[in-house]
Structure formats: C-alpha cells, structure tokens
Amino acid sequence: MLFNINRQEDDPFTQLINQSSANTQNQQAHQQESPYQFLQKVVSNEPKGKEEWVSPFRQDALANRQNNRAYGEDAKNRKFPTVSATSAYSKQQPKDLGYKNIPKNAKRAKDIRFPTYLTQNEERQYQLLTELELKEKHLKYLKKCQKITDLTKDEKDDTDTTTSSSTSTSSSSSSSSSSSSSSSSDEGDVTSTTTSEATEATADTATTTTTTTSTSTTSTSTTNAVENSADEATSVEEEHEDKVSESTSIGKGTADSAQINVAEPISSENGVLEPRTTDQSGGSKSGVVPTDEQKEEKSDVKKVNPPSGEEKKEVEAEGDAEEETEQSSAEESAERTSTPETSEPESEEDESPIDPSKAPKVPFQEPSRKERTGIFALWKSPTSSSTQKSKTAAPSNPVATPENPELIVKTKEHGYLSKAVYDKINYDEKIHQAWLADLRAKEKDKYDAKNKEYKEKLQDLQNQIDEIENSMKAMREETSEKIEVSKNRLVKKIIDVNAEHNNKKLMILKDTENMKNQKLQEKNEVLDKQTNVKSEIDDLNNEKTNVQKEFNDWTTNLSNLSQQLDAQIFKINQINLKQGKVQNEIDNLEKKKEDLVTQTEENKKLHEKNVQVLESVENKEYLPQINDIDNQISSLLNEVTIIKQENANEKTQLSAITKRLEDERRAHEEQLKLEAEERKRKEENLLEKQRQELEEQAHQAQLDHEQQITQVKQTYNDQLTELQDKLATEEKELEAVKRERTRLQAEKAIEEQTRQKNADEALKQEILSRQHKQAEGIHAAENHKIPNDRSQKNTSVLPKDDSLYEYHTEEDVMYA
C-alpha cells in the first residue's frame, strides 16, 4: 500500500470558508478521472522527499522511523481524528483524557490523543471571526451615520406595515451577513493576518463603540432611537457570537491564550475617532490627527469591499424596520422630530436649500481596478491619467457622523437619494414653475394683442367682401335681364328641336315596337314548335314504352316457345330413338322370320329325312347316324354356349353403348340448353342494342332539339344585343347629332344675333338719316310755305303707325 506524503490537511472547515469554484472543479475532475484510486494521500508535516509516494511496509521507511516511537501514533491521530471540535472533550487537556476518565457509555476509542491541528484550525477560525466582527461593527457605524425618511407611504400605513418590514429586514440581514461572511472568508484566506493583529483590531473596535455610545447621548431623540435599536441588535449578535466562540474553542489553554493576547481598550477620552473619508486618490480628510489604532482600523476597513448601492439600501431598510419593531415610543418621538425636519424646507421655501456638495455624506470608495502589468501597460490611454486627476481634484462632502448624519429620502420615482439633492430638486422645480407661470402670462398677453390685431384685419376684409358682393349683386341683376331675353329665344329653339326630336323618337319607337312584335311572334312560333316537339317526344316516349312492353311480351313468348320447342325436340328425339329401336326389332324379327321359314323348310326336309331315318331306325339304320348326330349335338351345344357367351358380351357392349349414348344425349341436351341460352342472350343483347340505339337516337334528338333551342335563343340574344348595340349607337349618334345641332343652332343664333344687331344698327342709321332728311324737308317746306306739298310729303313720309320710328318684332328680326 502506498501513501502520498504531500497530501494537504483534511480540514472540514476549508470547504465552508474557502468557496473556491476552481478547487471544487479540480476535485470533481480528479474524482471523475480516478474514482476507484487505491492510493490515498496521508497528512504529514515532513518535508518533501525524493519520492512522492512512500509505503509504510517498506524496510527503508521502517528503518528511518525506528528511532521515532511516536511516529505511528502521530500518523494514526492525524489520519483518524475521532473528536469533534464542538464536543465536550475539546475543553479538556489531552493528558486528562485517559482510560480511567472515559465513561463506559461513551462510544469513543480509548487512549487516543487529541489532534493538534484542530487547535491551529480554531485559531485561524477565531482570527476570521474577529475580522468579521470588525467589518460588521464598521457597517453598523455607517448605518448610524445615515437617517432615512420614507416618503412612499402615509403616516397611517406605518403601523400596519411594521411586521412585514421586520420580517423582510430579518431575511435581508441574514442574506447580507452570509454574503459578508463569504467575502470576508475569501479575504481572510488571501491576507492571513496574525493573532496579535486580530486582537489589536478588536481593541480598536471596542474603542470605536465606546466613543459612538458616549457621543450619541447628545444627538436628537430620533438618532437615540436608531442607535438604541442598533446597539440592541449588536448586543444580541455579540452574545450569539460569544456562544459560537465558546463552543468552537478547543480548550481552556487555547481560550486563555487567545484572551491574554487581547489588548485593553483605550479610554473614551483618548479614543474618540473622527471618521475619515478617503478619496479615490487615497488621501484622508479629518479634523483630528489619526492614531496608530486608527491606522490599523483603517487598514482593516480597506480590506473590506465597500457595500454596493443595493446593500446600502438593504442596510437602511433594516435600520428602519428595527426602529419600528423594537421601540414604538422611539417611533413616536422619531415622527415628532421628523415632522419639523420635513417642515423646515416648507417654512424656508423662499430660502435656498443646502448645497448637496456641503451636506454630510457617508464615505464610499469604489473598488480599485487592477492596473495593467503586462506589455500592454506601455500603451496606456492618456485619458486614464487625466480622469484620475479629475477624480482626485473633485471636491468631497463632509463626513457624516451619528451627531450629523446623512439625510436620505426614499421616493417612489427615484428610489433612495440624498435629502439635500431632493430639496435642491424641489427648489429648482419651484423656481422653474414660477418662471413658467411668468412666461405663460407674457405669452398670453402677446397672444391676446396679436388676436385683437388679426380680428381687426379680418373685419376690414369682411367689409371689402361685402362691398364686392353688393357690386356683384347689381351686376347679376343687370345681366339677368339680358339672360332672360336670350333664354326666351333659346327656349323657342329648344321647343322646335324637341318637337322634331319627338317625331323622330316616335318613329324610332314605332320601328322598335314593330321589331319587338316580330321578335315576339318568332318567339311564339319557336315556343309552338317546341310544344309540338315536346308532344312528339311524348308520343315517342309512349311508343317506346309500348314497344318495350311488346318486346317484353315477345321475349316471354319467345322463351316459352323456346322451352316448348326444346320439349318437342326432346320428345321427337325420344320418338326417333324408339322408332329406330322398333325398326331394328322389326328388322330382327323379319330376319328371324325368314330364318324360321328357312328353318321350317329345312325342318320339313329334315322331317322327311327323319321319316326316312325313322324308317331306317326301324330298320336300325340310325345307329351310326345317331352317333353322328350326338357328335353334331355336342358340337352344336358347344357352339350354343359360345353364342351365349358372345351374346352376354354383346349385352355388356350394348349396355356400355347405351350408357355412352345416354351421356352423349345428356351432353347434347346441355349443349342445346347452352345454345338456347346463348341464343336468348344474343336476342337480349340485340334488343338491348336496339333499345340503346333508340334511346341514343331519342337523346340525340333531344340534344339536337335543345341545341336548336339554344341556337335560337343565342341568335335571339345576339340579334337583341345587336339591336341594343345599334340602338345605343343610334342613341349616341342621335345625341351627337343633337349636340351638333344645338351647337350649330347656338352658332347660328349667335351669327343671327350679330347679324340682327348689325341690321338694327343699319336700320337705326337709316331711320336717323331718313328722319334727318324728313326734318330737313319739313324745314324747307315750312320755309317755302307750301302746306299742300308738305302735307303730302308728311303723309308719304310718316309711317302707318303715326310714329317717327319703324318697329319690328322679335320674331320678325329673328326670322327675317
């Protein structure tokens, strides 16, 4: 078995404190690579040798360890620690834990020394806890240096929401403490400060807490309530931490050694610390010279990452919840004290608010970015140094203290923001609203003046429009009379044109009526033909049904006759067969008759011979003949037997022949039946073909008839559309003729008017010249005193109407 002598200490708290993702990933990768590794690493304080892996079973290793008696015991204790750090045995010395001091019911190995590396672990953990306490107390101090006013809820809702806020703050405090512990554990692993430094840091925190409690008595009632609630929370947390530290302490000796190293706290008179604010450049600003403890505290505070904006909000919300849940009287006093604070800006509305740059503020330092150290650091942007200089040159706010806390306001629109900024925004908004009101008043005056000016201009324009309308009205009255005269003339022309148009229209209507009557007559003829064709179709259908009935009757009769014919044929065949048989029998009988006749004749001859034989018998001459006859009879009997056998054979042949003939008869009958069925099928097919041909002919006739009807309709529709198109074209032409006629009439009227006007002018000139001549003649007659001639001249010159002028009517002028 091999053991790795370079294995790290198997500390159970390292995984909880060092939450390093890289180590866990490496361990997981190592476990995946070798999950069943037999070689294990062992804890050892020995320096690294030449070989990484050493076996305790080798002779060299045993020879090197012979002088050290405690080697095996120490290795065993380091490898198998059986006592927990939180057990009751951790407060006792290892020498007191012998065989006699262990009770019987204790399930623990006997005479095993307490592992010494756990004491080092306890010291390291105690150092980390002290660092966490320092950071937590610093955060509480920063919390006291801030005061939050919640403007998102009313005063009536404050008492209702205390329980929910307390629960939320408790959960947020647990989460913040866990996050701070994790961050502090990481920092503790990196920095690894000594025990003496940790004790000095605890002394510094003790001095800071005493100074804050001594100075907090001079603050207002609201800050007292906040500090009391925070002190109570810290006391509870300190008690809990004391319990944890007592349970985690190893023994009396280690606890005493840890307490001895703690320095005595500095008195509150000498240890009053003014909090400092560090700029981004690293400089500190305070009114008091920092002491050594303050410097150490500053170094410890710098190690802690400053809380982000969200963590600050959570801390402030926790402070508010603790104030509401723990001290209701402190709430009332806080409300009384907060109301004058919030009413101060209202009473001092005319005064300018506090400058946000002069308001107290909790110092906050952003995490410093790592500077470039590689080759690219040579090409630093020039803007980075200028920005750093500008950041260092920026003025900072005064440091907030519990006596002079930073006032923060919580709003719905902007969340958490400084009260000075909030007052500044409200003050600027008020000034802006006043400026807007003044601007609106000035703009309204300008608008009213401009509106009045525009109204006057509009009134002048309206007066001009009225004058123009009056003049237009007078002109319309003058022109309306002229228009009336020309209108009357045009009306007469239009009446004549309409009369002519109506005459033509009547002619066209008569023509269309005649065409319509003709088309209707043609339509009626087509309908009559269609009805006749329908009657013919009905007759054909009736005839078809009758033919079908006759066909069915004929088919039934044919089938019956065919059956009767088959039966008669069968009977005839039977009769023929019987006749053939009878004829054969007759022939056979005739043959037999002839044979018998011949036999009788022969027998007669034989009888005569027999008589002669008898005579010879009597004469005893028959004996040789008898012998011959017997011989013949025996031969004949043999022949008879042969004939009988042949007859039997012929009978068997006859039965076979009859059977064959019967089979042939049946086959012939089947063939006759098949032929009859085939004949019937052919007749049916023929009739079906004839029926289909007749139906096709009827269908074709119907289609032809429908096609003729559709053609007639199509021709009718085409003719109708042609007539309509012709009518439309004629109407268009008529309309064009009308328009042309009206245009020509208008031109003619205009020409006639101009001609009439010229004629009127000429007539007027002629009348004037005639009157002038008449006046001259009358004047000459008067001068010559010839009354008779003058009377004659006057009677001849004067018109019939006894007037100086000749009047012509409008019709005479138009149709002259």
From Swiss-Prot:
Region (Disordered): 1-34, 65-101, 154-406, 770-816
Polar residues bias: start-end ranges: 83-92, 246-260
Compositional bias segments (type: Low complexity): 18-32, 161-223, 327-342, 380-396
Coiled-coil regions listed in the entry: none
Biased composition (Basic and acidic residues): 292-316, 770-792, 799-816
Modified residues (Phosphoserine): 286, 343, 347
Name of the protein in question: Uncharacterized protein YGR130C
Organism expressing this protein natively: Saccharomyces cerevisiae (strain ATCC 204508 / S288c)
